[in-house]
Swiss-Prot record:
Gene3D superfamilies assigned to the protein according to its UniProt record, in alphabetical order: Anticodon-binding domain (3.40.50.800), Bira Bifunctional Protein, Domain 2 (3.30.930.10)
Complex formation: Homodimer.
Enzyme nomenclature, EC number: 6.1.1.21
Name the UniProt record assigns to this protein: Histidine--tRNA ligase
One matching Pfam family: HGTP_anticodon
Keyword flag Nucleus: no
Family membership: Belongs to the class-II aminoacyl-tRNA synthetase family.
PANTHER family xrefs: HISTIDINE--TRNA LIGASE, MITOCHONDRIAL-RELATED (PTHR43707:SF1), HISTIDYL-TRNA SYNTHETASE (PTHR43707)
Record-level Gene Ontology MF annotations: ATP binding; catalytic activity, acting on a protein; histidine-tRNA ligase activity; transferase activity
An annotated GO BP: histidyl-tRNA aminoacylation
Catalytic activity: tRNA(His) + L-histidine + ATP = L-histidyl-tRNA(His) + AMP + diphosphate + H(+)
Length: 416
């Protein structure tokens, strides 16, 4: 039996990889325009980073992490999310000593042991944005506007932005007491996981997907009604900035996100009732992992989920020509000429290929069509002796007679 990829993983083959290149270029160009710089972090970290950052009681830490001991007995975890490693790198690299805010973006694999379903794999890939150093709601609005601009440029309609504030450590402590009083009356009816959350982080119960818990929290007191003055002002400022940017939003008081490091702003971007991007502010995480007391805000956007969103909205990613010039060959002399010509063209960054399979001329043209070549040329005895060949534009069949020694003319043709 042939060995297959592990359940929940997927190979990205050439028939799909061009879509990834398109999205990655789009994400990077937009991030660049906002002043963000790229960061790359290891695929595994010390387990403690996620226990302290993501939260001991979260589903991610309790149920979904790939954790193992190395040969020295140290507990390591394949990263289940991108923010904590970015924060760890920010602290370890002393980026807090730079002029603030520090704006970073990254592409990273994310690994979680989850039930495999449409749009959800055990290894998926994430584009992340993290902005450090400012408490101003204007930075939250900028981060949100960056995410919204991505979907706008991709042409996705029906995007809905949901926002909420989950307060700071001060007002959240008071709210948790109020929430626990409410939930205590329904304690026997909440799920076993939420019974644990009740004692450690009751606000996480608002995020539970169990039907019984979702029914109970419909009548729960809302964090928005118990914000301190500072958090209320911050949330009002966020709404003002979003309105100033012309970004519509819906206030959803049940958004808390599934990770414990969030504070104040949390948001989700939704399309066709599916969350396609999520993020928020995390003003305590940097200090939690050993850095200075410093605020931050960011988001994560799944690349697979974005591709699925494009597909479900009927949006096709343009497929660029794989080859600029395909050279067909008749005879050994032509093969030598094709070898030298392709080598010169490749040095000029022209994507070119020649026949390695001793195909017939008909088969060569069929192959050129399959690889989406823009131009083709057949080199045989006559072309080698005369030094002149006819280059064919595959799109419309137009032919161009060019000297094989005139490299600049061939270059100009392939760049048409």
């Amino acid at each position: 039996m042939a060995i297959q990829a592990p359940k929940g993983t997927k190979d990205i083959l050439p028939t799909e990889s061009y879509k990834w290149h398109y999205l990655e270029d789009k994400f990077k160009n937009i991030a660049d325009s906002y002043g963000y710089r790229e960061i790359r972090t290891p695929v595994f970290e010390y387990t403690e980073l996620f226990q302290r950052g993501v939260g001991e009681t979260t589903d991610v830490v309790q149920k979904e992490m790939y954790t193992f001991l190395d040969r020295a007995g140290r507990s390591l975890t394949l990263k289940p999310e991108g923010t904590s490693p970015a924060v760890r790198a920010f602290v370890e690299g002393s980026l807090y000593n730079e002029a603030q805010p520090t704006k970073l973006f990254y592409f990273t694999p994310v690994l979680r042991y989850e039930n495999v379903q449409k749009g959800r794999l055990r290894e998926h890939h994430q584009f992340g944005i993290e902005a450090f150093g400012s408490r101003e709601a204007s930075l939250d609005a900028e981060v949100i506007s960056l995410a919204m601009r991505i979907y706008e440029e991709l042409g996705v309609d029906g995007i809905e932005l949901n926002i909420n504030s989950i307060g700071c450590s001060k007002c959240r402590k008071e709210y948790n007491d109020i929430l626990k009083t409410f939930l205590s009356k329904q304690y026997d009816n909440i799920c076993d996981t939420c019974k644990t959350r009740f004692h450690k982080n009751p606000m996480r119960i608002l995020d539970c997907k169990e039907k019984s818990c979702r029914e109970i929290v419909k009548d729960a007191p809302l964090m928005l009604h118990h914000l301190c003055d500072e958090c209320r002002e911050h949330f009002e400022s966020l709404k003002m900035y979003l309105e100033g940017l012309g970004i519509g939003y819906k206030i959803n008081p049940l958004i808390v996100r599934g990770l414990d490091y969030y504070s104040k702003t949390v948001f989700e971007i939704i399309n066709k009732n599916i969350t396609i991007c999520g993020g928020g502010r995390y003003d305590y995480l940097i200090e939690e992992v050993g850095g200075p007391k410093m605020p931050a805000v960011g988001f994560g956007m799944g690349i697979e989920r974005t591709l699925l969103t494009l597909s479900e909205n009927g949006i096709e990613i343009p497929k660029l020509p794989y080859i600029d010039l395909y050279i067909g060959i008749i005879g050994d002399k032509a093969r030598i000429k094709a070898l030298t010509l392709t080598n010169k063209l490749r040095e000029k960054n022209v994507r070119c290929e020649y026949d390695h399979m001793n195909r017939s001329v008909k088969a060569e043209m069929k192959y050129a069509n399959k690889i989406n070549a823009r131009f083709t040329v057949i080199l045989g005895e006559n072309e080698i002796e005369s030094g002149i060949a006819k280059f064919k534009r595959m799109e419309d069949g137009q032919q161009f007679e060019i000297s094989l020694g005139d490299l600049s003319a061939i270059l100009n043709l392939t760049r048409m």
